[in-house]
C-alpha cells in the first residue's frame, strides 16, 4: 500500500511495489489514449515546488495532476526559497495545512526529507542533487515497452550523475544488470553506493564499472547518457568536459552494442557534447518515447501515493 507515503528514493520500496508503479504507468498510457482517465485526484490540491528550472518535469507533472482531476499550485524559485528566511520546516508545516501532496525539485535532497517529515503529506521527489526516481521509473517503463521485459543497460559519462543514482537503485531492487563507463574519479559517492550495493547483493543485481566505454556497451540492449555538466556545476564545467570527452555516445560506439540496442537520454541534451546528433536523431533513439512516458509515470505515482 503506497497511499500516503513519500517517494524520495526507490530504495524505500520493494520490487513488487516498484513493479506496481510501472504497471500502472502502462495503464495510464492506455487511459490517456482512450480518453478515459480515472479522476483519482479529484478535489485534491498538489503543490509543485521548483527550486531548479524544469521543462519536461514541470509540464508532465502539471498535466498529470490536471488529467487526474486535481489542482496544481506551482511555486517557482521566485515564489518560494526553501530555508532562506523561513525554515524548510515552517514552509512544510504551512503547506501541509493547504495541500494533499507535494512534488518538489530541490537543490538539496535534505529539503525533501524535511518536507516529508513536517508537512505530514506525501512528498514526491521531482529531482534532487542526489537522485531522480521518476526519471528511472520512466526509463525502465520505456525499456519494457520496447523489449517486453527489462534488459541490460550501459550508462556512459558521469558516474556521480543523479539520474544514474536512481537507475542504479532500480537495478539493485529488480535484480538487473547495469554497466557504468566513467573515469575513475567520477564514481558514485560511498554513502550513495553503500545501500545500492547492499540491495544488489539481496536481489542478485550486477552493477559494474568500466573506464572503457566500448567495453561497457558491448552487447547491451540499452545505451544511456546524460549531460556532463548539471545545473550548479558551471564553475567546474570546462574541467569536467575535458575529463569526459572520451565518453561521448557516437554512432561508432553504438555499433558495439546489440544490433537491436536503443539509445536513451533523460534530456535536455547538449548535442555534440555527450551525444552526436546522428545518435539522438537516429533510428535507435528512444529519447522521445522516454519524454512522452514521463507523463504516464507521473500519473501513476500521483495516483498511488496521494
Curated annotation (Swiss-Prot):
Pathway noted in the entry: Amino-acid biosynthesis; L-arginine biosynthesis; L-arginine from L-ornithine and carbamoyl phosphate: step 1/3
Keyword annotations of the record: Amino-acid biosynthesis, Arginine biosynthesis, Cytoplasm, Transferase
Record protein name field: Ornithine carbamoyltransferase
Residues engaged in binding L-ornithine: 162, 226, 230-231
Binding-site residues for carbamoyl phosphate, renumbered to this chain: 54-57, 81, 105, 132-135, 266-267, 294
Catalysed conversion reaction: carbamoyl phosphate + L-ornithine = L-citrulline + phosphate + H(+)
Pfam families: OTCace, OTCace_N
The protein's Enzyme Commission number: 2.1.3.3
A single MF term (Gene Ontology): amino acid binding
Homology family: Belongs to the aspartate/ornithine carbamoyltransferase superfamily. OTCase family.
Function statement: Reversibly catalyzes the transfer of the carbamoyl group from carbamoyl phosphate (CP) to the N(epsilon) atom of ornithine (ORN) to produce L-citrulline.
GO cellular component assignments: cytoplasm
Source organism (scientific name): Sulfolobus acidocaldarius (strain ATCC 33909 / DSM 639 / JCM 8929 / NBRC 15157 / NCIMB 11770)
InterPro entries (alphabetical): Asp/Orn_carbamoyltranf_P-bd, Asp/Orn_carbamoylTrfase, Asp/Orn_carbamoylTrfase_sf, Asp_carbamoyltransf_Asp/Orn-bd, Orn/put_carbamltrans, OTCase_ArgI
Domain of life: Archaea
Main location: cytoplasm
